[in-house]
């Protein structure tokens, strides 16, 4: 090998883009080594594995080579299997078979079967399995393990276990693969059975069981496995912290994070972003601030994903200035996620004009928006009532950025028209959509009809929803709300009766409030224990004071039964956000900000109570409902009564 060719190979190893690679390819041609399988194999390997969007070039290299060998084919099959187009792996594999002079080996089958797992085609998987049998490679450990993964990915646990049972001496990788397959096919008992049979287990075995239980929502089993683990690594702790948070047990997630620190281990990027995500979901502002301090002190502030999580946490906890401070501090490290998170945060708080300005600043910096950016932007326009701007940006998506609108973007436009009262325009917009509208899109319009009291259109929309999702309790409640607001109690009773007959249960409303770095959860209705009694007693005091000092009159249209006015007042007084507010006022020091997170949309009566309480008690109240943030201060709300 000459010095020049050796230099070309060293350049290839450091090559970062397709343009540079084509220049190196030109040098190979110049030195006459382009027909050598070793050098062409190196080029294909670099195209397929190391450079993004270079797979078509790798394929052309393969097609132009006189007699490509198995290594070249395997490399391309592997490249496609790890790409966004895994189905192309099968085409390359078939091409290899047709050549006649190249025979697939264990690597060929392992790569192509992995590709089949990624695009989840059980029929193609069966065909590849048959080919492996034909070539006598089904008993190969590498191929067998990949077959287990493929069948598990396609939801066919029975075949995954059959392949495993037929293996002569399965290694730990195969054991772990079949446990994973069981969990992916929702066979939790089968996974436990196989785990109990293992004579030798490694860290991965325990972590697979832990992750499987978490994904299945079996938290008690996950905790038991976690406590039995002989050694807990970063993956174990991260799985536990993130998984428990995703299952809604936020306080427990925080406890495990503290336990991780007490164990003398340092949180990694995954556990940090996971616990910050838990703070975001639960609205745990105080614990989030502590985590931010830890991030700064421990030197994690350079990690982009952690900063993005901080932006999201502060935004969802109601502190936009702090989110903006983190965002501004990132400077050159900002990625599309950073910009989008900040735009989404502003949108959540009704700062539509500022969100639009930031979007324009992002594009001026040369950052190209993606589909998610436009969802946040359209969301901002919707909550700020910027109808014309929203229409312009929706048009700009495809015309300027060549982004095909997806169902979420159409949903944002329906919300934009619906919130502004342009209900017929929203209806016509849905009818003219080039893609079939989903139940969520129609439900968005139904919510707007309910808010604006348009019963006639609400009934039409409900008919559409009956075709897509007839037994959704939320739709029936929205229609019931519209009838109740109009005083049509017979129609309300009819809906309630049909829900009882069909055994359709209404989604339980709950609210979270942070007191002393602990999250407390309240549900609507009367409870006779612990903190619920305390909250109810304080709420009675608040309601009396609001009536005396602010002339509060309950908006009984929020009560959904045809009962006496006094009973309606009693119903609306027990909403979960009111109980959370009362508990916070009872426990927090005077003047402390109150932060409440609710899973459903705040009703008009609760909204009125929050406004009056902020004035009478001199407190700032932040409520995050299903749709947006409401910042109550001095008797007014940041949403300007538009939500």
From Swiss-Prot:
Keywords: Repeat. GO terms for molecular function: RNA binding; zinc ion binding. Gene3D superfamilies: Tetratricopeptide repeat domain (1.25.40.10). PROSITE patterns: PPR (PS51375). Residues 549-643 are annotated as: Type DYW motif. GO terms for biological process: RNA modification. Residues 517-547 are annotated as: Type E(+) motif. It comes from the Eukaryota. Residues 441-516 are annotated as: Type E motif. Disulfide bonds: none annotated. InterPro entries: DYW_dom, E_motif, Pentatricopeptide_rpt, PPR_At4g14850-like_plant, TPR-like_helical_dom_sf. PPR repeats lie at residues 69-103, 105-139, 140-170, 171-201, 202-236, 237-267, 268-302, 303-333, 335-369, 370-400, 406-436. Belongs to the PPR family. PCMP-H subfamily. This is Pentatricopeptide repeat-containing protein At1g74630. It comes from Arabidopsis thaliana. The gene is PCMP-H71.
